[in-house]
Regions:
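Catalytic P-loop NTPase motifs of RecA-like helicase/translocase cores
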Residues: 93, 236-237
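Carbohydrate-interacting/catalytic domains
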Residues: 1-47, 55, 59-64, 72, ...
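Short catalytic-loop micro-motif centered on adjacent basic/acidic residues
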Residues: 12, 227-232
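Short glycine-biased active-site loop of nucleotidyltransferases that positions the nucleotide triphosphate
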Residues: 47-51, 97-98
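Hydrophobic or amphipathic alpha-helical targeting/insertion segments
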Residues: 74-121
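DnaQ-like (DEDDh/DEDDy) 3′-5′ exonuclease domain used for proofreading
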Residues: 122-183
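An anion/pyrophosphate-binding glycine-rich loop and adjacent beta-alpha core
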Residues: 356
Length: 749
């Protein structure tokens, strides 16, 4: 492996921020202290795509994102600045929403199984390819040698039509069938990404397909790309085999995988540096949450909302809904592999619901499969016979049924948990994050240290993250929300007022919105909150959903947001609570930032998060970043800034930690907790990475109520200098002195 970058900085490349634009900010990133430019997908994607995860041609750089010239400019700028380049790749699927834009899919639609690209896609060839694009007025036409439906165009098989032929008759002669868009979830004939019918699964298990789809990736490596981020490996038939092929293609690259690990789960033994950091995010988030607040938070939530379900029960319901409504075609395809098993579809679905992690990697993960089988039978004893018959096949790595089930369970977990249950279960939404368990109310200090020692020993080169393009809410939103675990009466007063105003609305969702208002704050652009609320309530899929919108209910929810702005009493309560949350929220934000930047692993800074940020789920977290303002503020920093609304303190902490990791990597080779004694000991996170010692304040409200640090002492040995404040210390130091100007410290010998 090449020397991994000391840190990365994620840039979202798109038409409005191209590779040329990225090249223009490389100098700023160098000054910030970043070690590598980390790019979102840059291969040719669907026209207008803002994210790039819908690649249409994996063999060329996206024209709208800067094309080959922009790519060359970015590489040159990074090389001149001494920065490495890391690229996000998407092997699991290709975008097919505009069939003509994907030449490989177009050819398959044209020639069917005889297409040279037929092996690229995971298609059920027992029937025509299902294309769910039609509305209620399925009026087709033939124009310019293509089948047309409004703006959609589809190819015609050679010899399948003649001038004057009836379009419906021509349609019947094709290798595909256009059907109503509502039929896709139940009738789709190809594997897709989660529930997105416009993202067709790619058969990377075929060596020829891997080689063909990775030619541009291989040339990127030859051009100097140092690292790869692999999107959604769990969608592949055999992620481990894929990673082995990728490691042979790029033997010196730093490779991380977007593998979502459940609490306690370990990454399989793949030839990768580690994950993309959601596991680290869960640990950092958790240690800033007051475990002692759980009982009160649970009681308050149940009393105000009437929601008596646990997180586990919400996840079960979410998964069941996803399988009943959306992943029907996937379940049917698997059940079709066991035609002699009565209730095979119900049994397959029940095991997927019961699966406690995203998926197994047979023969690894048998214990998780066995647990799921037992739980499935307990929940549905009438399926015992079907489960017993299917069990040997589900355990067989060579059985297509087992392979497809493993792909199904990951989609079920993601859609049922992150995209459904996390929008329904609103006890404490700071915990409702990718890779986290909403039922796990924080992480204790000793457990946090133990987890970092495991990380240092097992995956010291794994990525760590606080915010990504996929997080449910940004890092500082979660930092502010964490304060609510320490505020009882004050938080309840506002939450109760919001719920009371939610006439005709789901009380739990109103409670969810009340927390969102605290996490984001009184932003000037309330339309952001309206857009977020629309997405959140439709993802929850209770009173309203994407495919069955209840306009009256949605108007009521949006009116509740307007009340927070326009009703004097509610606005006053909101602002009073925000005033209480502000300073401890800043403390949490600085603490978690420094911890993430200095803990074992390679830290990533998501674009713009070196200043305070208030982002919510995508697309809100892909808003433009004002790099000119960040460059100006960075240049103005000459010493320790005040902690205030400017965000200068966060920028100072970020750049100081990044520069130290870049310039003195030898200080970050181990992990050991540093003893803290005194009345405030549980409010300090302190660890030594081998010469770089981090101290961060946790649970700041409780600390203030106890009178501050008092007699609390950090057990230093010898001489140290805090690179954040410039102050030097020799031997044990009072935290009241060490943390007098900032709630964090970064000491070096």
């Amino acid at each position: 492996m090449v020397t991994p970058p000391p840190s990365t900085y994620r840039l979202q490349i798109r038409k409005s921020f191209t590779l040329d634009d990225a090249a223009a900010v490389v100098g700023y990133l160098r000054e910030l202290g970043v070690g590598a430019v980390y790019l979102s997908p840059i291969l040719q994607s669907t026209t207008g795509s803002d994210h790039g995860y819908d690649t249409t041609d994996p063999l060329r750089i996206d024209t709208d994102r800067g094309g080959e010239s922009g790519w060359s400019a970015l590489l040159a700028a990074a090389t001149d600045a001494g920065l490495q380049v890391v690229v996000d790749i998407v092997p699991n699927h290709l975008g097919i929403s505009a069939a003509r834009e994907n030449p490989y899919w177009w050819d398959v639609l044209t020639h069917g199984r005889e297409s040279p690209y037929a092996a690229w896609f995971d298609i059920d060839w027992s029937r025509p390819i299902t294309v769910p694009v039609l509305g209620d007025d399925a009026v087709l036409s033939v124009a310019d040698g293509e089948l047309a439906y409004y703006e959609h165009r589809f190819p015609l098989a050679p010899g399948s039509w003649a001038a004057g032929d009836d379009p419906d008759a021509v349609h019947e002669r094709q290798h595909y069938r256009l059907v109503h868009h509502s039929r896709g979830d139940a009738e789709l004939s190809y594997r897709r990404f989660f529930t997105v019918t416009t993202l067709a699964g790619v058969r990377q298990e075929d060596p020829a397909v891997f080689e063909a789809t990775h030619r541009r990736v291989a040339s990127m490596i030859a051009e100097g790309v140092a690292g790869l981020r692999v999107d959604h490996p769990d969608g592949l038939v055999d992620p481990g085999e894929y990673q082995e092929r990728l490691a042979r293609l790029a033997p010196d690259a730093w490779i991380t995988v977007e593998k979502i690990l459940e609490p306690g789960e370990r990454l399989p033994d793949w030839p990768v540096a580690g994950t993309t950091g959601y596991d680290a995010m869960r640990e950092v988030n958790g240690v800033f949450v007051d475990l002692a607040g759980e009982a009160a938070a649970t009681e308050r939530y149940r009393r105000l909302t009437g929601d008596g379900l646990t997180s586990t029960e919400h996840v079960e319901q979410g998964k069941r809904m996803i399988l009943d409504r959306l992943l029907v075609a996937e379940v049917r395809r698997i059940a079709g592999l066991a035609p002699d098993v009565a209730d095979a579809d119900a049994a397959i679905a029940e095991v997927a619901i019961a699966f406690g992690v995203y998926r197994s990697y047979l023969p690894d993960g048998v214990a998780d499969l066995d647990k799921a089988l037992v739980l499935a039978e307990q929940r549905r004893p009438e399926l015992a016979a079907a489960l017993a018959t299917l069990s040997p096949r589900l355990h067989d790595p060579a059985d297509e049924l087992a392979r497809r089930f493993q792909q199904l369970s990951g989609a079920t977990m993601a859609k049922g948990t992150e995209d459904t249950a996390f929008y329904r279960y609103a006890r404490f939404i700071a915990l409702n994050e990718v890779g986290a368990d909403a039922g796990e109310f924080g992480i204790g200090l000793d457990d946090f240290h133990a987890l970092q020692q495991v990380r240092q020993q097992g995956q010291p080169l794994s990525m760590t993250s606080l915010s990504t393009h996929d997080t449910e809410r940004g890092e500082d939103v979660r930092a502010r929300l964490a304060v609510l675990a320490e505020l009882g009466e004050e938080w309840e007063r506002f939450a109760a007022a919001v719920v009371a105003r939610a006439e005709g609305s789901n009380a739990a969702f109103a409670y969810f919105l009340a927390q969102t208002l605290v996490g984001v704050g009184a932003v000037e652009d309330r339309d952001r909150l309206h857009a977020y609320a629309e997405k959140a309530m439709r993802e929850a899929s209770q009173e309203t959903r994407w495919t069955a919108v209840d306009e009256e209910y949605e108007r009521g929810v949006q009116a509740l947001i307007d009340l927070a702005y326009d009703d004097a009493a509610l606005r006053d309560g909101w602002e009073r609570l925000l005033a209480l949350v502000e300073e401890p929220g800043w403390s949490n934000a600085l603490g978690q930032k420094l911890v993430q930047l200095t803990m074992p692993g390679v830290p990533d800074v998501y674009q713009g998060t070196e200043l305070w940020e208030d982002s919510l789920v995508d697309p809100d977290n892909r808003r433009p970043v004002d790099f000119a303002e960040r460059r100006r503020l960075l240049a103005s920093l000459t010493g320790t800034p005040r902690v205030d609304g400017s965000g200068a303190a966060k920028l100072w902490v970020t750049t100081t930690a990044l520069r130290l990791r870049r310039d003195r990597p030898e200080l970050f080779g181990s992990y050991a907790p540093v003893p803290v004694t005194g009345s405030g000991a549980q409010h300090a996170i302190a660890y030594d990475r081998g010469g770089a010692l981090t101290v961060a304040t946790r649970l700041p409200v409780g600390l203030a109520r106890a009178g501050g640090w008092g007699d609390t002492v950090l057990g230093l040995e010898g001489g140290w200098t805090d690179v954040l404040s410039g102050h030097a210390y020799d031997g044990p130091v009072r935290l009241a002195d060490l943390l007098a100007s900032l709630p964090v410290a970064l000491l070096v010998r």
